[in-house]
């Protein structure tokens, strides 16, 4: 069974302690990091992914193939939606990828370049790219930012499908209804 273990994690920036003795275990399904802006949710995700080193504690995040969506979408702005997905998926781009674009409301954007998308459209495309990339675990930093209620619901459905087979670590500062049991880590 896949299991992400975080034990006594601490992270400081100078005199500022951002993560203080964080411990949890995450398995296939959704683990939600909940807390106000600036509390350390993004820092924790970056430590899990190995992008930052903790000052103390352990995490076995390097045991997994991760995909991530951070607050910056990091898309290829000169390409359209399909081009962004093909860049990640290569020959594995298929009907399922196109269906996910449709589900997330991006099926009718044609050859419009990503740089011309709204912020919400870019967010949904970044999420689609992460959901489709081969991985064991997803790190989703505020994945619903800029989404209206309808698109938020579509994104949630897609995330929950991924959580059937992957570890999903989802950060949010809002109390969002997640229609399945999930672990909540309050920071």
Each language-model region and where it sits:
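Walker B catalytic motif
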Residues: 113, 142-143
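Conserved ABC ATPase signature
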Residues: 113-120
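ABC-family nucleotide-binding domains
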Residues: 141, 148
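Helix-to-loop junction immediately C-terminal to a conserved catalytic motif
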Residues: 49
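Conserved ABC ATPase "signature" region
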Residues: 94-109
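Q-loop/switch helix immediately C-terminal to the Walker
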Residues: 72, 78-92, 96
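Conserved structural motif at the start of ABC-family nucleotide-binding domains
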Residues: 4, 18-21
